[in-house]
Amino acid sequence: MKLAVYGKGGIGKSTTSCNISIALRKRGKKVLQIGCDPKHDSTFTLTGFLIPTIIDTLSSKDYHYEDIWPEDVIYGGYGGVDCVEAGGPPAGAGCGGYVVGETVKLLKELNAFFEYDVILFDVLGDVVCGGFAAPLNYADYCIIVTDNGFDALFAANRIAASVREKARTHPLRLAGLIGNRTSKRDLIDKYVEACPMPVLEVLPLIEEIRISRVKGKTLFEMSNKNNMTSAHMDGSKGDNSTVGVSETPSEDYICNFYLNIADQLLTEPEGVIPRELADKELFTLLSDFYLKI
């Protein structure tokens, strides 16, 4: 199964992608996450550092594919998730689609592309050209990360249009939306009523999700460390200790959202070919909703 994760810039795609990758790994799947962003920080919370990009590695070898080994470009991450960063062209030059194509080509040359149960492409920002829609050429499903806001849903609608276009040439489907860090979902529900598509999950507005990115750790790793610390402290202070008790939701609670998403994806859902709204129609729908509040 190949997944492509899209959404408005800064919406939390990489945080979402990393936690979904671990959730899929916890369900027994062999997972590769491919970051498709010139910032090459998609897999940072999995590996703990900025790994070298495919393009940098190819450049250092003068694009001699035969001189590159899997360990040169594939790095092990937390929970057993393998990680690759495609990188990107120099600022103001080149095409992101070319970079994604070169990444897939190299992984095929290394006999690695088909060795995974799940490959997840984490793609930068909004779809603004055919190049950045390139991961959709390889994906079985697209996942759109959004929130309950005006701009994020505009981006989601544009991505939906790209899915429909790419679905003309191969069996791509939209698996659904993921609402990330939002206290409400009324605008999301209004949008999917007008443009029918599944909502895989809506994650609540929990600070731990943002903090995990700042710490450079996935929520699963934070949960594991906190559980170990609590167990150690409870053991040393006795059963009546309140150490580790928090008024905020635990990381375990948040991780269950990602496990639920993974479980839905592993059923290989039918998905949809979306019919995006026209810009004017969407603007009217969302702006009217705001004005009525």
UniProtKB/Swiss-Prot annotation:
Molecular function terms from GO: 4 iron, 4 sulfur cluster binding; ATP binding; metal ion binding; oxidoreductase activity, acting on iron-sulfur proteins as donors; oxidoreductase activity, acting on the CH-CH group of donors, iron-sulfur protein as acceptor
Cofactor note (record): Binds 1 [4Fe-4S] cluster per dimer.
Highest taxon above the source species: Eukaryota
GO cellular component: chloroplast
Reported effect, residue 25 to A: In strain: 2137 and CC-503
BP GO annotations: light-independent chlorophyll biosynthetic process; photosynthesis, dark reaction
Keyword Chloroplast appears in the UniProt entry: yes
Residues that span the membrane, as ranges: none
Major localization listed first in the record, in broad terms: plastid
Residues annotated for [4Fe-4S] cluster binding in this entry: 95, 129
Alphabetically ordered keywords of this record: 4Fe-4S, ATP-binding, Chlorophyll biosynthesis, Chloroplast, Iron, Iron-sulfur, Magnesium, Metal-binding, Nucleotide-binding, Oxidoreductase, Photosynthesis, Plastid
EC number(s) from the headed UniProt entry: 1.3.7.7
Residues reported to bind Mg(2+): 14
InterPro entries (UniProt xref): NifH/chlL_CS, NifH/frxC, P-loop_NTPase, Protochlorophyllide_ATP-bd
Cofactor(s) needed for function: [4Fe-4S] cluster
Residue numbers binding ATP: 10-15, 39, 180-181
Catalytic activity: chlorophyllide a + oxidized 2[4Fe-4S]-[ferredoxin] + 2 ADP + 2 phosphate = protochlorophyllide a + reduced 2[4Fe-4S]-[ferredoxin] + 2 ATP + 2 H2O
Compartments, as annotated in UniProt: Plastid, Chloroplast
Subunit structure: Homodimer. Protochlorophyllide reductase is composed of three subunits; ChlL, ChlN and ChlB.
Family: Belongs to the NifH/BchL/ChlL family.
Function according to Swiss-Prot or TrEMBL: Component of the dark-operative protochlorophyllide reductase (DPOR) that uses Mg-ATP and reduced ferredoxin to reduce ring D of protochlorophyllide (Pchlide) to form chlorophyllide a (Chlide). This reaction is light-independent. The L component serves as a unique electron donor to the NB-component of the complex, and binds Mg-ATP.
PANTHER family: LIGHT-INDEPENDENT PROTOCHLOROPHYLLIDE REDUCTASE IRON-SULFUR ATP-BINDING PROTEIN (PTHR42864:SF2)
Protein name: Light-independent protochlorophyllide reductase iron-sulfur ATP-binding protein
The organism of origin for this protein: Chlamydomonas reinhardtii (Chlamydomonas smithii)
Source lineage: Eukaryota, Viridiplantae, Chlorophyta, core chlorophytes, Chlorophyceae
Underlying gene: chlL
